[in-house]
Amino acid sequence: MPIVTANGIRLYYEETGAGVPLVFVHEFAGDAQSWHLQVRFFARRYRTIAFNARGYPPSDVPTDGTAYSQDHAVEDIRGLLDALRIDRAHICGLSMGGYATLHFGLRHPERALSLVVAGCGYGSVATDRAQFHRDVSATAERFLTEPMATLADVYCQGPTRVQFRDKDPKGWQEFHDQFAAQSALGHGLTMRGVQLTRPSVYELEAQLERLTVPTLIVTGDEDEPCLEPGIFLKRKIATSGLVVIPKAGHTINLEEPEAFNRAVLDFLTAVDAGRWVRRNPASETGSAILPSNKTNPSS
């Protein structure tokens, strides 16, 4: 079983393919297996690495709640790269993994060839922030006191998951069953330590405006909690592009794998070829007609 030790935590990982490294960072309800449709596709071109976060067996499940935080999630990505002797890599994350990917790019931009930030921003909108904290607190407590199978039934039928269930019942059932087999303790402590305490993307505005790593933002148009944050990220990261997948919810890499893979491949191809450039400031104007007085620094 492939294991690396990062920051004192044993992390399980799966590696397939050869070439430029491409690291996949999973969502709260997933694990390395959640990326199987991407690994099969991208391993033909890249050295793909998918790993289980701390709290997700066979990675370690620390019992100390202080072992879980957004900072730990970021440093585990760095620790994984260090352990595998990878200097720089493309980093692709969904949801919780999208947050970790974004923060990794902000903290360690020299280690990231590019960032794919998918389904990111849940709990960021100011008017929804209090409800988000109430929901997360209550759900974390349930993970720590109720059977994992019960929580999987609830979590996998949320308003941004029903799209996946309706389109692909078999795929959704596999996703549900994998989730139900995970660690309730790991999920409860992850929800308390990561989701409950992480900053809103709107709090990162100044850092986002300084980010120069090529970034692709991907969201489903029925993933309501992530739509507005996705547009915000696009506007603040000058080197970003935004893809909105129609009639899609939160689990976009499994729900719409062909659209997701194609968007990511086109992005990575452009980055690898040096053709992904920062936004022309002249396009940043509220007018649809009158030109901006800003100039393109690359011209």
Per-segment meaning from a language model:
Residues 9-66:
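Conserved HGGG/HGGXW glycine-rich cap/lid loop of the alpha/beta-hydrolase fold
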Residues 40-43, 49-96, 262-265:
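Active-site loop/oxyanion-hole signature of alpha/beta-hydrolase fold enzymes
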Residues 102, 106-107, 112-146, 150:
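Flexible "cap/lid" loop of the alpha/beta hydrolase fold
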Residues 211, 217-219:
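Short beta-strand/loop motif that positions the catalytic acidic residue
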Residues 240-299:
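Catalytic active-site module of serine/aspartate enzymes centered on a nucleophile-bearing elbow/loop
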